[in-house]
Regions:
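Acidic, Gly/Ser/Thr-rich repeat motifs that build Ca2+-stabilized beta-propeller blades
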Residues: 9-15, 22-193, 244-251, 293-330, ...
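Short loop/turn segments immediately following beta-strands, especially the blade-tip
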Residues: 144-153, 208-217, 261-269, 273, ...
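Repeat-solenoid scaffold signature
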Residues: 226-255
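C-terminal motif of bacterial Sec signal peptides marking the signal peptidase cleavage site
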Residues: 5-7
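Surface-exposed loop and turn segments in beta-propeller and other repeat-based domains
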Residues: 97-109, 157-172, 210-229, 265-291
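Sec-dependent N-terminal signal peptides
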Residues: 1-2
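Secondary-structure boundary elements
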Residues: 179-185, 209-221, 239-243
Length: 375
């Protein structure tokens, strides 16, 4: 368990919740400061919604462009750094040690070492750490055997899981995670070529689904790795208690999105940005934001309450699909926020991203924060 650093609480005002009823959307709607239209899915028994309680505290500081927080089943935590290609281990006193460097990472613009995921071993081994990263000519996913124990974690040589994901200075996607079905999911951006998103022969602009070793699993809608398409730059994925996959996505100039992901779904990019009324067979987002209020990256779900980290928006969004409630937390308190995950003991962890070249870092940035969440 991490020991919280004393004297690091930061006070932030409690927001007033905002709710709205979905209106009939139009493809040419003018952006409002925040569009809070949320569709309400059917659910058996809704879990009580949760929200942050009290002030966030700093768990660790001195991170360099952190990208992904990976909490292991043992309670240990690893954090990827985009530009250094380092995986850092969080120690109980809040300090950080280098667990290792991921080989072949070539940082460039928004590319570098991005998402992390973990697969427990089924043969008595410690399991596998998966990494999504930008190499010299493509984005790729590797897996590395986890070695050592808490306080001395490391990993062995990587073996390829997937190569050939389109690469660019931006729009690289990069989030990975194992779903409740045991399959590995990955978000792939359009690599700055909008046409990739509608091209089913391209891995770009997609959410991908694969076996732990990179093969096409049974049940994929096109008998390829493509699970959904029509995405611009999705950077967050998470599953609710019903096994439903959700994804956050960067828009271009008008709308950022939160999408409920269905197998084979076409989410519209580049034909549609934001809510387009369902024309052309495109699936509308369940939520959209003006880009200066979001630029969403990491996504976490706690008791079916969604939390979304926002970069340009510099806030943590809380979304309740069951009621249509959307509200911002900690606006401008910590700068750009890159990732958010469920923490230990009824907490939420999130990491700032002010050292990524687009923020205004303060001394000690970037930081990992913890805040309690409760109904």
């Amino acid at each position: 368990m991490a020991v919280l650093l004393a004297g690091c609480a930061v006070t932030a005002p409690t927001p007033a919740a905002s709710t709205s009823t979905p209106a009939a959307p139009t493809a040419t709607a003018t952006p409002s400061p925040t569009d809070t239209r949320v569709e309400t899915p059917s659910a058996d028994a809704a879990l009580p919604p949760v929200q942050p309680v009290g002030d966030p505290v700093v768990i660790a500081s001195g991170l360099d462009a952190p990208w992904s927080i990976l909490r292991l089943p043992t309670g240990a935590t690893l954090i990827s750094e985009r530009d250094t290609a380092l995986v850092r281990e969080l120690l109980p006193d809040g300090s950080l040690r280098d667990a290792g460097t991921v080989a072949e990472v070539e940082p460039n613009g928004e590319g570098g070492l991005l998402g992390l995921a973990f697969l427990p071993g089924d043969d008595g081994s410690a399991g596998w750490v998966y990494a999504y990263f930008s190499a010299a000519s493509d984005n790729r996913i590797v897996r590395m055997p986890l070695t050592g124990s808490a306080g001395g974690l490391g990993f062995g040589a990587g073996e390829p899981v997937l190569t050939g994901i389109p690469l660019a200075g931006n729009h690289n996607g990069g989030r990975i995670g194992f779903g409740p079905d045991g399959m590995l999911y990955a978000t792939a951006g359009d690599a700055g070529i909008p046409g990739n998103a509608q091209n089913l022969d391209s891995l770009g602009g997609k959410i991908l689904r694969m076996t732990p070793t990179g093969e096409v699993p049974a049940g994929n809608p096109f008998d390829t790795l493509v699970f959904s398409y029509g995405h611009r730059n999705p950077q967050g994925i998470a599953w609710d208690s019903h096994g439903q996959l959700w994804a956050s996505e960067f828009g271009q100039n008008t709308w950022d999105e939160l999408n409920r992901i269905d197998a084979g779904g076409n989410y519209g990019w580049p034909e549609v940005e934001g809510i387009g009324g369902g024309g052309g067979g495109f699936i509308d987002p369940v939520q959209q934001w003006a880009t200066d209020e979001a630029s969403p990256s990491g996504l976490a779900i706690v008791d079916d309450t969604l939390f979304m980290a926002s970069l340009r928006g510099a806030r943590l969004w809380r979304i309740l699909p069951s009621t249509g409630t959307v509200d911002p937390w900690f606006t401008d308190s910590f700068g750009r926020l890159r990732d958010v995950v469920s923490g230990p003991g009824g907490t939420l962890w999130f990491v700032s991203n002010n050292t990524d070249g687009r923020g205004s870092p303060a001394p000690g940035d970037d930081r990992l924060y913890q805040v309690e969440v409760a109904p």
